[in-house]
Amino acid sequence: MIKMTGVQKYFGDFHALTDIDLEIPRGQVVVVLGPSGSGKSTLCRTINRLETIEEGTIEIDGKVLPEEGKGLANLRADVGMVFQSFNLFPHLTIKDNVTLAPIKVRKMKKSEAEKLAMSLLERVGIANQADKYPAQLSGGQQQRVAIARALAMNPKIMLFDEPTSALDPEMVNEVLDVMASLAKEGMTMVCVTHEMGFARKAADRVLFMADGLIVEDTEPDSFFTNPKSDRAKDFLGKILAH
């Protein structure tokens, strides 16, 4: 479903991603872990070319990701993304935030899009907030709207870039619960997160990154109980000590 071959990414002289070769089959849930500056968010953002790459190729569902133009827009429509910040339109209601892309991009009828929006808001547990505006919702609720909005495009892949890092601790679980239920339903997912419990419970596979490299690529149990690299041991020692 996702294939990265020989991917290199620089920011000026800084080598952000080095020789990334990665294949993620359909339905797999991959959690990307690593210290700050390891390249995990950059990896996530290159998958739908929010970040360009200097070398290599990225394929989504067998098609090479174009550099720009309509082909890129079409492929991007198949890749949902949820960020740290919710990026909801403040002047639109929750329901209208969710219906906007299906109507504009997928050319869906308004009545159909509204029906879809309500079913997705129900799925993430906030159908009763449909007519409110983003500022009237908590951070956790807004992030769940962002997930519903991404799902409204019926994506083949969902990317999550630290979706809980801007939330108050008591709101983290409500977002992780939605992500875990998506994982159970067979959505192909790439999640950059610091939530170790989620990685253990929901991931099929853990990628550990450091210095722009994929240092470990293994099953969650193996990573948490028997990390192979010193970098991973050091990372887990710091994270799990608290």
Curated annotation (Swiss-Prot):
Summary of the knockout phenotype: Deletion of the gluABCD cluster almost abolishes glutamate uptake activity.
Protein name according to UniProt: Glutamate transport ATP-binding protein GluA
Catalysed conversion reaction: a polar amino acid(out) + ATP + H2O = a polar amino acid(in) + ADP + phosphate + H(+); L-glutamate(out) + ATP + H2O = L-glutamate(in) + ADP + phosphate + H(+)
Localization, UniProt: Cell membrane
Intrachain disulfide bonds: none
Residues reported to bind ATP: 34-41
Subunit (UniProt): The complex is composed of two ATP-binding proteins (GluA), two transmembrane proteins (GluC and GluD) and a solute-binding protein (GluB).
GO cellular component: plasma membrane
Pfam families reported for this sequence: ABC_tran (PF00005)
InterPro entries tied to this protein: AAA+_ATPase (IPR003593), ABC_ATPase_HisP-typ (IPR030679), ABC_transporter-like_ATP-bd (IPR003439), ABC_transporter-like_CS (IPR017871), MetN_ABC_transporter-like (IPR050086), P-loop_NTPase (IPR027417)
Membrane topology, as annotated: Peripheral membrane protein
Molecular function via GO: ABC-type amino acid transporter activity; ATP binding; ATP hydrolysis activity
